């Protein structure tokens, strides 16, 4: 397949922010795509080469890409850097530069999607002393034969700056339309994706074997399952209204959610965002098999840092020390953990997803022995507000954040958020009754002591129905100097030339970011806003919701994907809850 077809499609997609138009462009692209190439196209659309859990990263720096452009075009590095500074996008700069190309290539090889993909894959696999030279050689070979537009998108893929604003849901909509003619069939694709975490594979099977084969997707050991997510509630009373008379309550621990795939002595660990994190937890790899009484199993747990002397739970941030590349053995000793199990997804070759919560819990307790390192998260069956309050108090005294509430008869809904799981967190005195996990979508340059960093951030909630991120506040308090330095390092590579199509904000930021980083904030209250877009028109016509006096808690939720952020429905629930509290107080 000619790469020019893909480049033209990318160019159209970059020019619109409308989801329907993006979907239509994708449908047109998929219909032009040969069956054997469809998986590669889907991966490239996502800005990757393989599914996340395989950990294939291109690792190409801007300086290396600039050298490759210079080698291919014959134009000095300084001039390329000047063009880059004008627009802030190396892909766009390459288009301009290569139109002025002074070098002539006599033997031009066709640029195909297959060639580009295979070359990028070779680049991703290169290691060792000569790897940088080889990377430049491969990049230059592509740029030599590419048109300026093709080169632009090759570089954007290489640098991780392809900003099409296309979410996975939009890709699945387009696949369903292109290969079945019915958007409703997205549900079948979604199930396959939720159990495989590999959208490229789903697309390939759909294109080559049809929808009936996609329906046969099952859990594969050592491929992560997309996690089930929870809504939030503000009070015990609200929980009972949503869940009925009898349900389970578990401690909500402040740790890292881990999915454990185990067969014999082989253990692979995945994060909430499907990253392979086995290297961060050699202690889990070593100790967990001894507790398992099954041939193979997939479990979910919270890895929680503890004070080894007292056994008390420590904050999530303590686990970040384990994410360093080196000296992991030292970090394991300095920052010990316990593994706190809460679900079983697969056992002895069979899926447990369809089992009710109560059955899954009983099975988990039966096949996993507890010891000092591996625990079952404390659970109780609750029937009324007093039961919840008592267990909630126990959980807080034990060092947890609150409770997870789960209906007893619910299956495990991979990749879904719904009312079968609810979270009830501890109150913040004199503040909004819960923290919020918000997506960083924009930044404002700092002044005074904060010069050189982003002094204030623009944050957003996730709007599930529209698959967008809606502005809810600016936050500039709660940041230490170290936080600001770290945020600058994390956010700078995510700067985009224009606002991502999935961002819904009337407020203009100094810079826009790819919506990826999630941070935790608290606030004094939620108010109506004529400016912010969160829950716009849901409470009052022409008004959205905003946070009053928001403050960063110090927690960067690096384990969360942007789509795991607090939703507008959650914010509406919190807003209505605070209004009810105010009303109740007025009656006292």
Swiss-Prot record:
It comes from the Archaea. PROSITE patterns: DNA_LIGASE_A1, DNA_LIGASE_A2, DNA_LIGASE_A3. Its cofactor is Mg(2+). Keywords: ATP-binding, Cell cycle, Cell division, DNA damage, DNA recombination, DNA repair, DNA replication, Ligase, Magnesium, Metal-binding, Nucleotide-binding. The keyword Metal-binding applies. It catalyses: ATP + (deoxyribonucleotide)n-3'-hydroxyl + 5'-phospho-(deoxyribonucleotide)m = (deoxyribonucleotide)n+m + AMP + diphosphate. Its EC number is 6.5.1.1. Pfam families: DNA_ligase_A_C, DNA_ligase_A_M, DNA_ligase_A_N. ATP binds at residues 250, 257, 272, 302, 342, 417, 423. One of its GO terms (biological process) is DNA recombination. The active site is at residue 252. The keyword Transit peptide does not apply. GO terms for molecular function: ATP binding; DNA binding; DNA ligase (ATP) activity; metal ion binding. Belongs to the ATP-dependent DNA ligase family. DNA ligase that seals nicks in double-stranded DNA during DNA replication, DNA recombination and DNA repair. PANTHER family: DNA LIGASE 1, DNA LIGASE 1/3 FAMILY MEMBER. This is DNA ligase. It comes from Nitrosopumilus maritimus (strain SCM1).
